[in-house]
Amino acid sequence: MSVASSSKSKKMDNVNNKEEKIYEKWECFHNWVHCICIVTFDLELGQAIEAIYPGHIMLSEQERSNVCYLAFPDSNSGCMGDTQYHVRIRQNGAVVQDTKALKEYDRRSPPFLQCDKDYYWGYVYFRQVKDKSLPRGYFQKSIVIITKLPFVNLFGELCALIAPEFFEVGSAVMEAIVREIDQWPPPVPGQIVHLPLIGVLFQTYIPNQNYKSTVPTIAAIDHAPNFHATRRLILTSAYEGDMFRSLASVVSYVHLLWELVLLSEPIVVMAGSPTGCSEMVQALIAMIAPLKYCADQRPYFTIHDSEFKEYTTDAPSPPAVILGVTNPFFAKTLQHWPHIIRISNGSSNENQKYKIKKSENLKVLDSKPGVYTQYKPFLQKDKTILKKLFRGIQTKRPGEVQTALLKRHLIELTESFMIPLERYIATLMPLQKDISPFKATPIPELFNPDDFFATLSSAGPQLTTGIKGDWVGLYRRFFRSPNFSGWFHTRYTELSQKLQVIQLEALSQADLKTWVQGKQEVELVDMVLRIRQKLEKTYIDEVPIGKSVKEKLQERINDITHTLPDDLKDILNHES
């Protein structure tokens, strides 16, 4: 390496270290928010970032470009007034380490609510109003909250509070906002959080891995610490939107759509506004909860996105992604996609929305709302739930009740599909009696589809659902999807870590004083190094191992080293 390049490298390291220290200073803020961007329309530059709060945050050029284009509706002439929606932005700048609180959040939250190391969520509030004092005659500006957390409901409400206040008061209020967020408690799964912000107290519940456990009641939330707030906003869910409202126009095809999302099929949602398409994409992803959607999703996607070419290629098989779009250009560019959902632009009443047809011929794709696909579902519809939902429309049942009915049905359907898989994967664990403290850590057996199918006759979905159909065919397709790969990788990792813990616990209780008798020095040294290696691996893999087990393992190491000559003791102590 030359002197110049070495000097440059050291400078870069110093810059990175400085940024990390500043980031740590704002750790409480970054538990919730990466940054807040103000995006404006510049006559010479077009969309441009006017300011980033806090000021130390550096976005890469590509991240800045994506934020700018996603912050404004694609064809904003029809979006007068205020427009809210959310986006997903690929992270490609400097690697930002999650805070300790976010790492702990990921460990304790359900998989479908965990952070994604490769993406940010962006929550957008766009305002366009006439203003004759400005050169173009319009005021156009967006506030974008960028975060790792998928709390669509909470951040939507935060955006709705922050943006109008900023438009009214200016940068001074934004400085106050970031300081106040920096005082918030961390997002702890299983707890109610109280988040004060410019006179409003937001209260909501952060779900834990037992996502079906009873959420604390409003009465429990009512006992909040004393905050100086002019009003309180209680959110029964931090992450759930109004599922039924989003899916109302296509509710007849809810089981077909559930299969498409489950199988990670390419879907494009075409709508007249970013709000409509982002809400629909969110509702589709939520259909398979508690299973995590592991393919890509873009609640709102534009022709300027850095992945535009990647997703609009003429390849025979489009990528596994759900795209939400508004630009009419996509109607032609993506017409070869196998599954297209068109959402009505108008505010037609519910009864009209439910007359949307399904087309079997993609060539007739036009402006009519509907589900355009040639996909043939593996399972039959559950007519009982559809009748309930249609009856609810006729009787004007409240939307939140309709959403609760639909959500419960879809969760039960997903669980009926996944329980046989969960039951089977548990059988891949070696028997505890076969786990020896003196041998290599065993690994789970490999997944065998034929062995799994053999379990279905006695322990298949029919135990928990009355829905008929080709369940085996659905499983076969599922095994080729990113959703299966993601689920299996997570479960296999959990089983492997569990085996590590079981073996280390056995090793910590083993009688090594007896074991050392008759052993060669090389065997004893090897055992010490292996125990240390196992401990180091648990640290790297973040395996949850108790403090007492670690202490006992150190005692076992001491049991061995006490029998070794002093020169070997010194070498081992030096290496530890």
What are these regions (language model features)?
Residues 2-576:
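Acidic, Ser/Thr/Pro/Gly-enriched alpha-helical scaffold modules and adjacent low-complexity linkers
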